[in-house]
Curated annotation (Swiss-Prot):
<dbReference type="GO" id="GO:0019031">
    <property type="term" value="C:viral envelope"/>
</dbReference>
<keyword id="KW-1164">Virus endocytosis by host</keyword>
<dbReference type="GO" id="GO:0075512">
    <property type="term" value="P:clathrin-dependent endocytosis of virus by host cell"/>
</dbReference>
<dbReference type="GO" id="GO:1990904">
    <property type="term" value="C:ribonucleoprotein complex"/>
</dbReference>
<keyword id="KW-0472">Membrane</keyword>
<keyword id="KW-0946">Virion</keyword>
<dbReference type="InterPro" id="IPR002531">
    <property type="entry name" value="HCV_NS1"/>
</dbReference>
<dbReference type="Pfam" id="PF01539">
    <property type="entry name" value="HCV_env"/>
</dbReference>
<dbReference type="InterPro" id="IPR002519">
    <property type="entry name" value="HCV_Env"/>
</dbReference>
<feature type="glycosylation site" description="N-linked (GlcNAc...) asparagine; by host">
    <location>
        <position position="189"/>
    </location>
</feature>
<feature type="region of interest" description="Interaction with APOA2">
    <location>
        <begin position="6"/>
        <end position="57"/>
    </location>
</feature>
<keyword id="KW-1133">Transmembrane helix</keyword>
<dbReference type="GO" id="GO:0044167">
    <property type="term" value="C:host cell endoplasmic reticulum membrane"/>
</dbReference>
<feature type="region of interest" description="Important for lipid droplets localization">
    <location>
        <begin position="48"/>
        <end position="51"/>
    </location>
</feature>
<keyword id="KW-0694">RNA-binding</keyword>
<feature type="glycosylation site" description="N-linked (GlcNAc...) asparagine; by host">
    <location>
        <position position="93"/>
    </location>
</feature>
<keyword id="KW-0812">Transmembrane</keyword>
Length: 321
């Protein structure tokens, strides 16, 4: 609704300016006012749809949280070497958003290359936007930030300034407040896919590329029961206060968002959906045909016999010989 006021001010002001144009001001002003009324009708429809559905009163704050789930598919990085630009997977300094002791938050489409000592090595990509030193996610630091985020959101909602806080959060994404902790370079040419690439891994990544938001939400839904136990045992008071407040006011959509946000930081995080990929691999292997050997019939002087040693390269791979 607050955004609608800004849009109405712009459209109505534009219509008034069109009306002051000599000779053609009357028809242009009328058309511009009709357009402004049409925009107002669309805004009323959006306000009704998002404000009257049970548990779905989306505000700018909720849209700010949902904006964190999108992953641009066209992200790419280049490295400037003596005037020549080379496409690389290494993150430039402009792609680094936040740095912790053992984790780096960056924009999608690259992997940080950190210079430590006298060597540069690639960090392990845990998610499209988070890389760690050894592939293990430091859940303590991230969950501390989630506590602060949810606690701030709860306070903003209790004070009825959720739209203002949401606007501040959106503007805050344009700036970096933390100091640099690591020396990132572009001399590694890191791989987006660490480890052994299998067909199941490629199929899983293809599914995530089709709908990264849906894949992320489904993976987090399966972690909610364990996340509830973790937030109680770990005394995450910000998250608990947020869930309690939003439950009391009947805002179940925000309760679900808080649970998904906390469940996204799991103590047993695997690289690029490796947990679900490993489970799916075990199911698919049950239907695998297994090794086989083709039987070859050889005609020698008019008589047929079986030659079991006539193996080609593919047979050798299937049988293990």
């Amino acid at each position: 609704r607050n955004l609608g006021k800004v849009i109405d001010t712009l459209t109505c002001g534009f219509a008034d300016l069109m009306g002051y144009i000599p000779l053609v001001g009357a028809p242009l002003g009328g058309a511009a006012r009709a357009l402004a009324h049409g925009v107002r009708v669309l805004e009323d429809g959006v306000n009704y749809a998002t404000g009257n559905l049970p548990g779905c009163s989306f505000s700018i704050f909720l849209l700010a949280l949902l904006s964190c789930l999108t992953v641009p598919a066209s992200a790419h990085q280049v490295r400037n070497s003596t005037g020549l630009y080379h496409v690389t997977n290494d993150c430039p300094n402009s792609s680094i958003v936040y740095e912790a002791a053992d984790a780096i938050l960056h924009t999608p489409g690259c992997v940080p290359c950190v210079h430590e000592g006298n060597v540069s090595r690639c960090w392990v990509a845990v998610t499209p936007t988070v890389a760690t030193r050894d592939g293990k996610l430091p859940t303590t630091q991230l969950r501390r930030h989630i506590d602060l985020l949810v606690g701030s959101a709860t306070l903003c909602s209790a004070l009825y300034v959720g739209d203002l806080c949401g606007s501040v959060f959106l503007v805050g994404q344009l700036f970096t407040f933390s100091p640099r902790r690591h020396w990132t370079t572009q001399g590694c040419n890191c791989s987006i896919y660490p480890g052994h690439i299998t067909g199941h891994r490629m199929a899983w990544d293809m599914m995530m590329n089709w709908s990264p938001t849906a894949a992320l939400v489904m993976a987090q839904l399966l972690r909610i029961p364990q996340a509830i136990m973790d937030m109680i045992a770990g005394a995450h008071w910000g998250v608990l206060a947020g869930i309690a407040y939003f439950s009391m006011v009947g805002n179940w959509a925000k309760v679900l968002v808080v649970l998904l946000l906390f469940a996204g930081v799991d103590a047993e995080t695997y690289t690029s959906g490796g947990n679900a990929g490993h489970t799916m691999t075990g199911i698919v292997r049950f239907f695998a045909p297994g090794p086989k050997q083709n039987v070859h019939l050889i005609n020698t002087n008019g008589s047929w016999h079986i030659n079991s040693t006539a193996l080609n390269c593919n047979d050798s791979l299937n049988t293990g010989w």
